[in-house]
Amino acid sequence: MAILSIQSQLAAGYVGNSAAVFALQRLGREVWPLPTVLLSHHPAHGGSQGGPVPVHLLTSMLDGLVSRGGFERCEAVLSGYLGQAEAADIVGRAVARARAGTPGAVYLCDPVLGDDGRFYVGQDIVTPMHALAAIADIVTPNAFELGVLSGETVATRQQALQAMRVLQARGPGIVVLTSFIGADTPPATLDVMALDGAAAWRLNLPGFTQKFHGAGDLFAAVFLDAWLAQRDTGAALGKAGSATHAVLGATALPAADELLLIESQHLLPAPTVVFSPERIA
């Protein structure tokens, strides 16, 4: 069985598919990467070249997978940074194909819209992202994205949980808040939270002063792997949080400007410190 991963790809660096594909393969998964955007490196470094993959090319690649019968063994679709609104239609078609071809196929939507109070996608992508979140089985927003998708204020732990419930009511059975520092989050830490039905968990992790590119992409991939393995949301939260934190810790030590994913790959299946989530509902 395979995972179709539809998101950005870099020539150098580890965000989007450049992070997710390797992580999933290292964890033993077959992955089919479909790039929405091809860039030389992360735009935050300046001078990035490349751009969105033409929609007709994405469509033809998807059709090629269909002709090979690929969706009869596609257990999950993972989507991230779209780069253009039209790519949302490709994702929607892929999800429909996977669900038709493989009963029980799962769709995880990482709704990449922005962070730290600002968008880094065009406004034309916001509405299609609402639609994708509504058809997802699992959605993994950061705090900013949760606020956008739910329309709720996300400033405290209780507000975050309420916003997750609002978003859940619009479609996705599982909502995972990938990073949150609220007014009541303990100092020098961050929260990762998950909601599955009425059950909720919170994982409090030591924070970092360094900003990382690709941390959310890595978390979403590892969470999907862990969830597929056990179908246990609380356990998947602990595994994904622990593995991602371990990689970030390895990256922060030398203050590297890209995730040291290759150097720390051994931490993905076996992080040195395992954090356990707290059941909060």
Region spans (language model):
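Generic secondary-structure signature for well-ordered alpha-helical cores
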Residues: 29, 63-71, 96, 100, ...
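Short, small-residue alpha-helix embedded
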Residues: 147-148, 210-237
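Charged C-terminal helix
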Residues: 234-281
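Conserved phosphate/ATP/ADP-binding segment of small-molecule kinases
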Residues: 120-200, 231-234
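Buried hydrophobic packing segments
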Residues: 20-23, 220-227, 240, 244
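Conserved N-terminal subdomain of the carbohydrate kinase-like
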Residues: 1-116, 263-278
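Short pre-catalytic strand/loop immediately N-terminal to key active-site residues, enriched for Gly-Thr
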Residues: 11, 200-213
